[in-house]
From Swiss-Prot:
Gene responsible for this protein: maf-2
Gene Ontology biological process terms, A to Z: nucleotide metabolic process
Transmembrane segments: none
Name used for this protein in its record: 7-methyl-GTP pyrophosphatase
Keywords: Cytoplasm, Hydrolase, Nucleotide metabolism
Pfam families: Maf (PF02545)
Length: 199
C-alpha cells in the first residue's frame, strides 16, 4: 500500500496493537491541550463518549495538517462513573482514591478512534466497555499499587487489564481493544475500505 499511516499518539500500548496487527505506520504527537478542549464540552453537557470522539478528532486533525497526504489515526479514551469523569491519576494517592471509588461499582470506558487526512475527518467511531470492579479493601489496593508501581499512573483507570489490573474486576462487558484504548476491529475495517491496508 502506498498510503502513509500516522498514529497521532506516543502510547506504547496503541503502537503495540497496530504493530501486532501487521500495520506499518509512524507516530506523531498532537499539539493540543486536552483539558482546555474538554472543559467547555463538559460544561455544555457533552457526554463522555462525545468528549472522547472530539479529542480523538482534534488529535487526528492536528497531526494530519502537519503530514500532508497521510491518513492519521487519532485516539482518545474517557472514563466515567455516573456523572463523574476521571483522568490519569497524577500520583499514587490519586490512583488509590480512584480505585476506592471504583470498588464494587461499574464504570464506563469510552474509546474513540478517528481517521483524518489533510485536516479533514474521514471517519469516526466510539466503542464502550462497562467495567465492574469487585469489592476491594484498602489493604488489597495498597498491595496492588505497590506491585504495579508507576504503571498505574499511565492509565485513566489506574489499571491495565493486560496485566495484574485484571484481578480488580468481577465482570467486563466490552471488547478487549476498546478497554485498552483502540477499537481495533472497526479501525481495521475502515482502513481496508480506505485502501490503506490490504484486504
Amino acid at each position: 500500500m502506498t498510503v502513509k499511516l500516522v498514529l497521532a499518539s506516543k502510547s506504547p500500548f496503541r503502537s503495540a496493537l497496530l504493530k501486532n496487527a501487521g500495520i506499518e505506520f509512524s507516530t506523531a504527537s498532537a499539539d493540543i491541550d486536552e483539558r482546555a478542549v474538554e472543559a467547555p464540552l463538559y460544561e455544555s453537557g457533552a457526554t463522555p463518549e462525545d468528549v472522547a470522539q472530539i479529542l480523538a478528532e482534534a488529535k487526528a486533525i492536528d497531526v494530519s495538517e502537519k503530514n500532508p497526504g497521510a491518513v492519521v489515526i487519532g485516539c482518545d479514551q474517557t472514563l466515567s462513573l455516573g456523572d463523574e469523569i476521571f483522568h490519569k491519576p497524577h500520583d499514587m494517592e490519586a490512583a488509590r482514591r480512584q480505585l476506592q471509588k471504583f470498588s464494587g461499582k461499574t464504570h464506563q470506558l469510552n474509546s474513540a478512534v478517528v481517521l483524518a487526512r489533510d485536516g479533514k475527518t474521514l471517519w469516526r467511531h466510539v466503542s464502550i466497555a462497562h467495567m465492574t470492579m469487585r469489592d476491594l479493601d484498602a489493604g488489597f489496593i495498597g498491595r496492588y499499587l505497590g506491585r504495579v508501581g508507576d504503571i498505574a499512573l499511565s492509565s485513566v483507570g489506574a489499571y491495565q487489564v493486560e496485566g495484574p489490573g485484571i484481578q480488580l474486576f468481577e465482570k467486563i462487558d466490552g471488547d478487549y481493544f476498546t478497554i485498552v484504548g483502540l477499537p481495533l476491529l472497526p479501525l481495521l475495517a475502515e482502513l481496508r475500505r480506505e485502501k490503506c491496508i490490504d484486504g
